[in-house]
A protein has these predicted regions:
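Conserved nucleotide- and phosphate/pyrophosphate-binding catalytic cores
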Residues: 1-187
Length: 187
């Protein structure tokens, strides 16, 4: 913001989140008040992108819930963080409003819901995990991606620096101009 203000420019746009708030913070499968984290000791607190279908299903079935049936409305979810967490995950992965999920599953027990949630996660996550494993087993492809990415980043950075030099009022130095100055002023 300081650069924008000091040089009266909008060169560095403010970033906008790509993930909606409700989906940006997924809670632990073991504790609905804690964020899901790969640093958690228990592998059953999270779904990893490389988990196989059986493991995803097992983790969801063991996810912490209370003994009460699934709530029928949002207000009933207020004091049930584990239920809210699983319902939000299902809602996000299936692109449904939470109210629609509650209309479908409200009053039912969690076992049926967990089966549906597990199936949805398997359908969404397993293709990603398969691709990750393919990429990790193809070192030549990964090396090419790294080299291509480095070249693209360098091109973008060079272009950005040129624009920043213009905005700030600095003269752009090239190696040729540096060598010319050296040759002119060498002692």
């Amino acid at each position: 913001m300081g650069f924008q203000r000091d040089f009266n420019t909008k060169f560095f746009p403010l970033t906008e989140p790509l993930i909606p708030d409700a989906e940006s913070r997924i809670m632990s499968l073991r504790d609905g008040k804690k964020k899901m984290s790969k640093s958690d000791e228990s592998d059953f607190s999270r779904i990893n992108l490389t988990d196989d279908p059986d493991l995803i299903s097992q983790k969801i079935k063991k996810a912490k819930t209370d003994s009460a049936p699934i709530p029928k409305n949002l207000k009933e979810l207020d004091k049930r963080p584990e239920a809210l967490n699983l319902i939000q995950i299902y809602s996000s992965i299936n692109k449904l409003e939470i109210e629609k999920v509650l209309n479908e599953f409200g009053g039912k027990n969690f076992s049926e819901f967990k089966n549906k949630l597990g199936d949805s996660l398997i359908e969404s996550i397993c293709p990603i995990g398969k691709k990750i494993k393919e990429y990790l087993n193809d070192s030549q492809y990964l090396e090419k991606v790294l080299i291509d990415g480095s070249q693209k980043a360098s091109e973008i950075a060079t272009k950005n620096l040129e624009e920043i030099y213009d905005i700030v009022g600095l003269k752009k130095f090239t190696w040729n101009s540096v060598f010319n100055l050296y040759n002119i002023y060498k002692c």
